[in-house]
């Protein structure tokens, strides 16, 4: 643990009812302030379980999660916007339950609308948005509470390939510009290389078996793909999770909050 960390996961253990081995088996993870960390791994490896435990949506058998210096916000695979509210109203919804509801909060929402390229859609309803636009609104809603840690559970998986490529570069710029610490789940290696400062390969019952730094010139998409393929083959031959969770894909609580959670 370091004073430079925004998030620490310490010894996280989780076993689902009926399972013989834990899906999270003493997982440790640190994400630095302003760092973007991307988690790759097979379906059923426990990636989403880990993210939900960090968010406080899933209880742990043991271990803890520390969020340092601010709030936490989460973006899910589907935008899940309220259909009867406008784009602006969806973004400001979370602010209604906070003390910072004044002019400064409204100005920040205006800034987000501009920065995210959706200011012209402020009065639109969700039914009038494309998939990429709706997910931008979902991300803006999470950023509106000014989180220190942003969790993203396959946020671009529902988008078509062209839109996904556009949005992933935009999302990386937003994360860097706002200085947010981000933890993202992805199945797409090229997406992970765009979004992440570090990429970790996650395995059920093991945790992170390999972590790469994307600023390392020796790290390539081919190297990560080969590791992904070899470990998926290993997992298939040595299952550590129930059969219902063993579908493998190759790419195409106890929460302690150090300074408030949003």
Task: Please name every model-derived segment.
Residues 55:
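Helix-to-loop junction immediately C-terminal to a conserved catalytic motif
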Residues 125-129, 133:
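Conserved ABC ATPase signature
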Residues 144-148:
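A short, proline-enriched helix->beta-strand linker immediately N-terminal to the Walker B motif
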Residues 150-154:
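Catalytic Walker B motif of ABC-type/P-loop ATPase nucleotide-binding domains
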Residues 161-163:
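Helix N-cap at the start of a conserved alpha-helix in ABC-type nucleotide-binding domains
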Residues 179-185:
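Conserved H-loop
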Residues 202-233:
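Conserved beta-strand-loop-alpha-helix hinge in the C-terminal portion
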């Amino acid at each position: 643990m370091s004073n430079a960390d925004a998030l620490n996961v310490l010894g996280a253990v989780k076993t689902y009812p009926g399972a013989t081995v834990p899906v999270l088996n003493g997982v440790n993870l640190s994400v630095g302030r302003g760092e973007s960390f991307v988690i790759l791994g097979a379906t059923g490896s426990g990636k989403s379980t880990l993210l939900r435990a960090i968010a406080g949506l899933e209880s742990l058998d043991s271990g803890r999660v520390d969020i340092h210096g601010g709030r936490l916000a989460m973006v899910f695979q589907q935008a899940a916007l309220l259909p009867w509210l406008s784009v602006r109203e969806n973004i400001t919804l979370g602010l209604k339950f906070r003390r910072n509801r004044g002019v400064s909060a409204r100005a920040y929402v205006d800034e987000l609308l501009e920065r995210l390229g959706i200011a012209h859609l402020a009065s639109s309803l969700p039914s009038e948005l494309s998939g990429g636009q709706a997910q931008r609104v979902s991300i803006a809603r999470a950023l509106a509470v000014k989180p220190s840690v942003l969790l993203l559970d396959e946020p671009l998986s529902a988008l078509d390939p062209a839109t996904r490529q556009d949005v992933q570069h935009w999302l990386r710029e937003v994360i860097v510009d706002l200085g947010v610490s981000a933890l993202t789940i992805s199945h797409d290696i090229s997406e992970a290389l765009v979004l992440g400062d570090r990429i970790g390969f996650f395995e059920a019952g093991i945790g992170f078996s390999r972590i790469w730094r994307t600023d390392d010139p020796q790290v390539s998409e081919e190297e990560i793909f080969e590791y992904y393929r070899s470990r998926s083959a290993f997992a298939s031959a040595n299952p550590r999770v129930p059969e219902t969770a063993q579908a493998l894909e190759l790419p195409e609580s106890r929460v302690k909050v150090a300074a408030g959670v949003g």
